[in-house]
Amino acid sequence: MSRLSANEAAQLLGVSVPTLYAYVSRGLLHSRADGASKRRYYDADEVRLLARRRADAKRAGNVAERTLDWGVPVLESRITQIADGKLSYRGRDAIALATAATLEEAAALLWECPLARVQAAPFVAQSFDAARWRGWLDLWRDRPPLERALALLPATAPAALSETARSVPSIADAAPFDAARGLPARDADADADADADADADFRRRDARLDEAATLLRLATAALAASTPSAEPVHRQLAAAWRVNDPRDVGLLRIALVLCADHELNPSTFTVRCIASTGAPLFGAIAGGLAALSGPRHGGETLRVAALLDGAARARDLDRYVAAQIASYALEPDARTRLPGFGHPLYPGGDPRATLLIDALIDALAARSAASPALDGTLALAEAVQAALGEKPTIDFALAALERTLALPAGAAFTLFAAGRVAGWIAHALEQRADGKLIRPRARYVGVDHAA
């Protein structure tokens, strides 16, 4: 734990030392005695959290409007941070993580559990009815990924998750993972009741992790029109899409990790609202998928694909871009000047897009492969940046990946959704642990009821 003196804490908060002491007396901050002296010290993380809360309060203004419009945070989370143009998962640089990690490793970080728990999925590995799944899949194989997932998840998840509940590991198996999971430590001197409670805690935690790992695989298989597998998600998608080059398979891995979470976006807020009601986890994930489908969220990749198609047919790229800018300027959301460009949270450019596009360029250069599709994609990005000063977002990068690798239509959306399921699960688990019902209020602006 990093420690601060009273002067250091006051400076970080931008207040006087007497005001700092007032915060302590009001319970907003805690001080701790230094055993070597009479001085008190402060936990740096706690001070920084209070500083962020004060900053949020100062800029709250008309909270009812701004909290729902890229404004003041509406709830607290320890999962993902977006600040100063950087994206972090539980304090780790998500961009650096994506260069080497699998989605399962990112999920283990987001879910705060050992990697082995994410990889386990006992239902998929031991008792999954593949023939029954294929029968359902045949009915939906020709439908878009989202429709297929929304149909198959409710049909298969309840049976799968009841099976995981019967296969929860024993307390003896779970005990070595106490620290990694952040579970309450076992007290050797605890009485029998406390021991039984701890055992129940472990079992509930294990059941939730089995449920989460199973849902990750069911969602992936439904989106990709494949059979659920314990293989890493990027390899499952590569097999479904017949991607064989190891460099290209690596690009799928990078994309999934970059999409794993992005703080409190519309789909994640939907997931948290559903989870707060006590609904089943698969219900929260299904709600997230429905929200993700919107053209201003995960469905943005489909609009980018249409933009790329038009650019490929255009005789004059600059005139095409100007016409598209004029067309999108008529949309209700003035920020949506062109799909796939300019992210409000990244004024200097979306780092996720930068990494994925650079990795795509490097993968093709490594095998000296010419790609008219990539050349056209990069030309469009340059033309838009020249016209608007806007840089590509992750939606554009995913569409570029789909187009360059000749993946099936909708693959960009599938990558976005399959990766984001890991983050949704993390948020659902965090919301369940919080135990509060999310119930915002609306400010009525209609006609008053006549007296």
What are these regions (language model features)?
Residues 2-189, 197-451:
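Hydrophobic alpha-helical bundle cores within soluble ligand-binding/oligomerization subdomains
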